[in-house]
UniProtKB/Swiss-Prot annotation:
Residues 264-327 form a coiled coil. Component of the mitochondrial large ribosomal subunit. Mature mitochondrial ribosomes consist of a small (37S) and a large (54S) subunit. The 37S subunit contains at least 33 different proteins and 1 molecule of RNA (15S). The 54S subunit contains at least 45 different proteins and 1 molecule of RNA (21S). GO terms for cellular component: mitochondrial large ribosomal subunit. Its main location: mitochondrion. This is Large ribosomal subunit protein uL29m. GO terms for molecular function: structural constituent of ribosome. Keywords: Coiled coil, Mitochondrion, Ribonucleoprotein, Ribosomal protein, Transit peptide. It holds the Pfam family MRP-L47.
Length: 332
């Protein structure tokens, strides 16, 4: 009789063999056994070579690596004799004659040089325990130039703010004065007076003659309307049809689409007359731009005009290249 063992009522079920727990039969011995396709480190061809000692010659660094900017002419460390000790900081009067681009470039040149000096000063002070006065003196000169650059930029910023405050009071007077001179100029001075109109629109409304450089905002759209009205008034004194169109518009252009069409037309009497006829057709068709959609619509117009101008420039360059190729072929 077998001795009884205590167990749970699920023990027999858990210990029972199933088709998943039965051991699989041993596979039959194969006659054609293939060799492994990958050679292991136990191969007899293994050769032990001497370790390669770490050295700078074993490392390669591209010449355009950004971290080279922390080194002066790719030198690990300059000696005090190699430093430029005869230079002086830029003076404020000298910096006032520089443009914003020049000041921006000079600022970052000074900043990079100070970073190079700070690294060299740290190496000399903590690694070689030598004197660092030469590095600190040059860094202080550069720092003087940098705070003077900020001083000049601050002067310009305050001058711009004060001029804007004063001009806000006199702006309308200036616009009326320019409009009077613009309309009273004789026809033989059209070229000069329209050049002054370009300077006027850039100074008052920020409208550049290069269409792709403009930022479309409320001031830009208001400037388009003002310039379009000025061009109509200029040629209304010479053309009766343009005069009638201006009277129909109550002596001002208020639609952004109409103003853009008149603004982009040539500064000639015939071109303005054609633009007036095109605007009449737009009005007859009921095509207008809502004031709420002016910015988005004008931005689309500007983008399309810029693309068209770029296509013309590309086509002209291709034609010029073809002509040069023909001339060279004829020469040969």
């Amino acid at each position: 009789m077998f001795p009884a063992r205590r167990g749970l009522h699920t023990t027999s079920r858990a210990c029972a063999r199933t088709r998943f727990t039965k051991p699989k039969p041993k596979p039959a011995k194969r006659e054609n056994v293939r060799l492994p396709t990958q050679r292991t480190h136990h191969d007899n061809d293994l050769k032990i070579t001497a370790p390669i000692p770490p050295a700078a010659a074993n490392l390669t660094c591209p010449d355009d690596h950004p971290l080279w900017q922390f080194f002066s002419e790719k030198k690990f460390l300059r000696t005090p004799e190699e430093l430029d000790t005869l230079s002086r900081p830029w003076t404020i009067p000298e910096l006032r004659r520089k443009s914003f681009t020049d000041l921006h470039s000079l600022w970052y040149t000074c900043l990079k040089e100070r970073n190079v000096l700070a690294r060299e000063n740290h190496l000399v002070q903590f690694n070689f325990e030598a004197q660092t006065e030469a590095y600190q003196d040059i860094s202080e000169k550069i720092r003087t130039t940098m705070w003077r650059i900020r001083h000049v930029l601050s002067e310009r910023d305050w001058a711009f703010k004060i001029a804007n405050e004063k001009f806000a009071v006199e702006k309308q007077v200036f616009i009326e004065s320019f409009e009077k001179d613009f309309l009273e100029a004789p026809a033989n001075e059209d070229e000069e007076i329209f050049e002054s109109l370009q300077r006027f629109q850039y100074a008052i409304y920020g409208i550049s003659e290069y269409i792709d450089e403009n930022k479309v905002d409320r001031t830009f759209v208001d400037g388009l309307k003002a310039v379009a009205t000025l061009k109509l008034k200029k040629f209304a004194l010479r053309n009766e049809d343009i005069k009638n169109f201006l009277e129909e518009s109550n002596n001002t252009i208020v639609d952004a689409g109409e103003s853009f069409l008149l603004y982009t037309s040539e500064n000639t009497e015939s071109a303005i007359a054609e633009a007036c006829q095109a605007v009449r057709e737009l009005r007859e068709n009921g095509s207008s731009v809502s004031r709420y959609d002016e910015l988005e619509t004008v931005q689309e117009y500007v983008n399309k005009l810029a693309e068209a101008q770029m296509a013309k420039v590309t086509e002209a360059e291709i034609q010029l290249q073809e002509e040069d190729a023909k001339n060279n072929a004829n020469t040969l």
